[in-house]
């Protein structure tokens, strides 16, 4: 397939790395995915929401439940095969979620090879939305105190509030253990030999040479700062092994080295979040922001900023 004149990104050595959001229907548009690769899109955020089909139907996320298009996993892998990394957005707390969801989500994330790109959150009912109205009318909304205690204003249907809160913490821990996280990144970037579209060309052919040298410098900066800054011996040792592992497996391609160094650094961020979740004293009724849904945390911060 031809696409006319050579894209501006290619002519200038791909100076812009792009990302976007899309529905999983993207997997069915071959031409669009090819064009995204040529335009230097690196990643796409996809609202998977849940591996539980009943929850997807409940939320009218019907494009995620289309057997003729393939399973969710098959469609994620199809997008990845077009040199686009998929960031999966996942939510727990739907009416059809029971305790099994806390094992199902980490398994889906692993099978999807979603690396660091798995964003797991608690369902939160935003005021004035149909969900908020329905929950309010059915008496399934937490009050302010309970929202702070459980991290969300949603009262689950098939489990207790404590089970939802503790199950969410458990799912986060499972998803971001060292072995789980790096198992996913290894599966994608080493086992599958994942390459972003510009790497299909000779990296050192003009005008990519300047970009390649810059990526080497950035890789060295990220890797050295990471190994100096991380104080926990177990984390630092694993990060060092991962850096050597990618060097041995993928050689000296500057872009892939930089991306993988960033992936390793991002694990440190998730490790801090899961550590905060594990250390939270759930008996005192005060939840850290890491345990709250994003909208809930923003609401609390906004309230605290208002002068008394």
Positions of PLM-derived features:
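Acidic, Ser/Thr-rich low-complexity intrinsically disordered segments
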Residues: 199-241
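C-terminal non-catalytic accessory extensions
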Residues: 229-308
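A structural motif corresponding to the C-terminal lobe/cap of the Radical SAM core domain
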Residues: 2-212, 221, 289-308
């Amino acid at each position: 397939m031809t696409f006319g004149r050579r894209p501006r990104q290619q002519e200038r050595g791909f100076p812009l790395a792009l990302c976007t959001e899309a529905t999983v229907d993207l997997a069915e548009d071959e031409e669009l995915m090819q064009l995204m690769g040529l335009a230097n899109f690196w990643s796409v955020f996809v609202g998977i929401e849940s591996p539980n089909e009943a929850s997807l139907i409940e939320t009218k996320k019907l494009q995620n439940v289309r057997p003729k298009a393939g399973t969710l996993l098959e469609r994620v892998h199809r997008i990845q095969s077009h040199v686009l990394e998929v960031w999966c957005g996942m939510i727990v707390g739907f009416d059809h979620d029971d305790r099994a969801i806390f094992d199902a989500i980490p398994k889906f994330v692993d099978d999807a090879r979603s690396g660091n790109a798995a964003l797991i959150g608690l369902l939160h009912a935003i005021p004035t939305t149909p969900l908020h109205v329905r929950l309010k009318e059915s008496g399934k909304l937490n009050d302010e105190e309970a929202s702070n205690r459980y991290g969300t204003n949603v009262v689950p249907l098939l489990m207790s509030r404590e089970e939802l809160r503790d199950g969410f913490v458990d799912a986060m821990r499972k998803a971001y253990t060292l072995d789980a996280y790096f198992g996913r990144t290894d599966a994608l970037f080493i086992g599958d030999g994942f390459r972003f579209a510009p790497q299909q060309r000779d990296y050192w052919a003009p005008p990519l040479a300047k970009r390649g040298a810059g990526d080497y410098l950035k890789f060295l900066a990220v890797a050295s700062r990471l190994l100096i800054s991380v104080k926990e011996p177990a984390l630092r040792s694993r990060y060092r092994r991962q850096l050597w592992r990618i060097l041995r497996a993928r050689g000296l391609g500057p872009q892939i080295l930089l991306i993988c160094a960033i992936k390793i650094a991002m694990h440190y961020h998730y490790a801090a979040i899961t550590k905060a979740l594990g250390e939270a004293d759930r008996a005192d009724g005060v939840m850290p922001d890491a345990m709250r849904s994003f909208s809930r945390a923003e609401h609390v911060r906004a309230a605290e900023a208002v002068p008394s």
